Amino acid sequence: MSDSLLVTVLLKHDQSKNLEDIQRHMKQQDWWERFPPQGVELVSWTVAMGLGQIVTLRLPPSLLPALNVELERSAWGVFSTEVFPTYDFIPVRETIRERVRN
């Protein structure tokens, strides 16, 4: 079993708030310093226009509760959140490609 897992967090903007309101809330919550929590690796952070921010994190399973609490503490109020267990499909894809070639 791996000592870490990947988690993808979908942060959907609260469209009832404008950008200034969102940034004010994030500053008040110290979002940029607190997220992701210490010990959690930021793998990628992308924006999908019309959807929101998509953040992929690598963390030990023991830090999953800390991630949850930080999302509740800092993100709620300006984002709705969805969290998904994630894995790297590239090695699986390569295995399948090799199998179907033979």
Language model features by range: what are they?
Residues 70-74:
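A short linear boundary/processing microfeature
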Residues 75-88:
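Conserved short beta-strand edge segments in small beta-sheet-based binding/regulatory domains
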Residues 1-36, 41-52, 59-65, 69, ...:
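Short S/T/G/P-rich N-terminal loop/turn motif that feeds into the first structured element of a domain
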